[in-house]
């Protein structure tokens, strides 16, 4: 239960940062909410003992904190079922930005942002809003297969291409 309490407390700290990041990127009046869902309550040891034969049969444990999950909703509707790809991607990006924001708030240090190919699933307005949401003092490394967003970036960005294992300016 200690792990679950820590996770629930962390999510409570992250929730306002997630909502703000989503509003900044989404640009709409969509309300995102995230709740922690523990897989099961009760004594984990007892549950593991009771399911040992089944766990061996399946080759994996059926109980434990690895089965916990997040319930994410947009405007009260299950995001996994009803959100568009852009909305789902915006939610995932918002969660990462929220982690960065909370880490900066707690430590006083801005983390490095490693961003892997997020632009293919975002419309142009969300791309620009995402770039504007990155902290100005953060080092951000962005990989992409789409370069069209680079021309609409809010400020000039150095760009490189990786070719035959070597970096070369674009």
PLM feature spans:
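Conserved short hydrophobic beta-strand within the ABC ATPase nucleotide-binding domain
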Residues: 157-160
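Walker B catalytic acidic pair
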Residues: 116-118
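Conserved NTPase motor "head" modules and their coupling/switch loops across ABC/AAA+ ATPases, GTPases
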Residues: 2-112, 121-125, 129-133, 137, ...
